[in-house]
């Protein structure tokens, strides 16, 4: 009897082994052989189909299996991954076994090296919000998964750590920023608190109302500060200062190479007495002649910087042509009605051509750029694509994109009536002339690219543009009784032909650096770039410059020795931005 029982027992055991099925009994698994998890950890959910009851286990405590078993059918494997605070990367092996099947399934969860917290944690909630938005909206969002994030840092350092961490991955976010050679000078993406780091057109300032000064030498005899741009409606404008005025003394103190910074700042601030001269040139533009305009009391007062500094009509001598000239300083929806009114004035005087001066325009609202594009193109282009926005891979795969069309008020971000209304005030041009510089960026370059996509001829005069072919969606949220404004680069800007490869800037048709040429009044033959545009319009032929003038002027020469660019009170935000959304 005992022998029989042993034989039967052995038979049952051998039968169980023979009944194990080949394979693993798992289908449609959502995991990969290797799965990267973010440094700060989180929960991973993987779906799969099991042919029988199953169990799962992890080789590491930091990667906890929360659903350790389940029944046959559609199943969910949930893993809870801890934040990595260690200075080395780590991995865990997850094994899933299905009852009745011979082979378990294993896969690996990897986590990059972490870091210990370095801050006081005061802005942790701000940083968590920033990280969430960046992971969703940033144009190179997938690279953030590989960046160790220390949420304890101050918000500005935390934001920089994200951008720098993505850049460390072979500069995948190269187009987020302005470069000089192989050096990134700054990022376009920005995070600001209530502290006013920069301002947009229309915001209030206090001072004289001079937009830009330049410390320079004229010939061998004169040294001073030249007025480059005056803001309309300000104390400087009311005092009669114009572009090209030469200041040789401030409050009786003569300008020198050692005091130009302090005197220049005093002129920006106002409430000073300045000695002003006009400058003319003899000997074929090689010898400067100063004519005193006297001492001018330069006041100081609150002022705003409008989007339009000048619009005028220039009659072209010895022709029947008229050119509209527009000195446009920033794309701002608050000034779109004034922009439309300026084009009405152009239409009323029957202009045949347009000179668009974007030398100092570093961008602004995408909606305003579309209004300007419509005012130039007109009814013949109604409904045609002006700009197409391409978002990050995740949003693109989800079918998300954004379009802006000539004369169509329905846009990706909102319904904006001025775009449609602009059709009734448009010039309907097939060709325009644009004055450009390295400052010309974003929404300004969007005009150039958008019109060229419609086969409108855009002739550029000046220096290569900034090369900002990306834009930003903004979001505002309040923390600790402060507003935080986040503008990450979140889309590429393409035209109707799908072209977006202008990160190195647009090269001018007539390239000339006018920074060493003494400035003349805007919209006149005394302004070097304006002169070239007017000559081009008059002759219908592109101006041919002596080779020396492609880089530096050969007449009316000035030698700048001091940079007063960073001192200027008006420093527009720029960009190609969608209107920010407030989150609660």
Per-range role (PLM):
Residues 323-326, 330-341, 345-353, 362-584:
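C-terminal "post-core" interaction segments
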Residues 83, 98-100, 278-280:
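Surface-exposed loop/turn motifs at beta-strand-loop junctions within extracellular Ig-like
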Residues 88-100:
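A short beta-strand micro-motif common to beta-rich folds, especially ectodomain repeats
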Residues 115-354, 368, 378, 552-584:
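Flexible, low-complexity junctional segments that flank or bridge functional domains
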Residues 6-34, 99-124:
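Bacterial Sec-dependent N-terminal signal peptides
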Residues 18-20, 25-58:
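Solvent-exposed, low-complexity, repeat-rich "mucin-like" stalks and linkers
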Residues 82-88:
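Short, surface-exposed loop/turn segments at beta-strand-coil junctions that are enriched for proline
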Residues 49-78:
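Surface-exposed binding patches on compact interaction domains or structured appendages
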């Amino acid at each position: 009897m005992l022998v029989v029982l042993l034989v039967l027992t052995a038979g049952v055991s051998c039968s169980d082994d023979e009944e194990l099925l080949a394979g693993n009994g798992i289908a449609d698994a959502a995991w990969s052989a290797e799965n990267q998890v973010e440094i700060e950890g989180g929960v991973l959910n993987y779906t799969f189909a099991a042919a029988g009851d199953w169990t799962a286990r992890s080789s590491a405590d930091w990667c906890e299996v929360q659903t350790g078993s389940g029944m046959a059918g559609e199943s969910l494997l949930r893993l809870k991954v801890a934040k990595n605070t260690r200075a080395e990367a780590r991995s865990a092996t997850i094994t899933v076994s299905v009852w009745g099947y011979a082979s378990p399934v294993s896969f690996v969860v990897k986590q990059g090296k972490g870091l210990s917290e370095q801050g006081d944690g005061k802005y942790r909630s701000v940083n968590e919000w920033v990280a969430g938005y960046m992971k969703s909206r940033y144009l190179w969002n997938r690279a953030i998964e590989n960046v160790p994030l220390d949420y304890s840092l101050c918000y500005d350092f935390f934001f920089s750590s994200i951008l720098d961490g993505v850049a460390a991955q072979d500069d995948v976010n190269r187009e987020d920023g302005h470069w000089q050679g192989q050096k990134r000078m700054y990022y376009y993406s920005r995070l600001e608190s209530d502290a006013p780091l920069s301002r947009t057109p229309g915001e209030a300032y206090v001072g004289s109302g001079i937009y830009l000064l330049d410390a320079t030498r004229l010939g061998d005899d004169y040294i001073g500060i030249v007025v480059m741009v005056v803001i309309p409606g300000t104390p400087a404008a009311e005092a009669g200062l114009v572009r090209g005025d030469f200041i040789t003394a401030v409050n009786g103190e003569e300008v020198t190479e050692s005091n130009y910074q302090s005197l220049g700042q005093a002129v920006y601030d106002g409430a000073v007495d300045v000695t002003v001269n006009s400058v003319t040139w003899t000997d074929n533009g090689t010898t400067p002649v100063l004519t005193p305009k006297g001492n001018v009391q330069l006041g100081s007062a609150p002022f705003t910087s409008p989007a339009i500094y000048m619009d005028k009509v220039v009659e072209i001598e010895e022709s029947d042509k008229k050119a509209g000239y527009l000195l446009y300083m920033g794309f701002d929806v608050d000034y779109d009605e004034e922009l439309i009114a300026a084009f009405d004035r152009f239409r009323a005087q029957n202009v045949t051509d347009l000179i668009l001066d974007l030398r100092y325009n570093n961008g602004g609202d995408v909606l305003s750029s579309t209004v300007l594009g419509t005012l130039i193109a007109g009814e013949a282009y109604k409904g045609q694509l002006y700009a197409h926005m391409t978002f990050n891979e995740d949003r693109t795969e989800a079918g998300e994109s954004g379009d802006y069309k000539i004369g169509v008020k329905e846009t990706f971000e909102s319904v904006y009536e001025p775009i449609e209304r602009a059709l009734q005030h448009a010039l309907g041009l097939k060709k325009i002339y644009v004055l450009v510089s390295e400052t010309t960026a974003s929404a300004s370059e969007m005009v150039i690219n958008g019109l060229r996509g419609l086969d409108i001829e855009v002739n550029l005069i000046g220096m290569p543009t900034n090369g900002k072919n990306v834009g930003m969606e903004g979001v505002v949220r309040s923390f600790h009784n402060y507003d935080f404004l986040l503008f990450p680069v979140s889309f590429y800007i393409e035209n109707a032909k799908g072209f977006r490869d202008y990160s190195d800037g647009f090269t001018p048709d007539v390239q000339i650096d006018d920074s060493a040429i003494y400035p003349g009044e805007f919209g006149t033959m005394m302004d070097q770039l304006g002169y070239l545009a007017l000559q081009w319009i008059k002759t219908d032929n592109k101006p041919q410059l002596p080779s020396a003038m492609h880089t530096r002027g050969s007449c009316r020469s000035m030698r700048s020795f001091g940079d007063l660019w960073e001192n200027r009170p008006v420093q527009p935000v720029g960009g190609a931005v969608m209107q920010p959304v407030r989150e609660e």
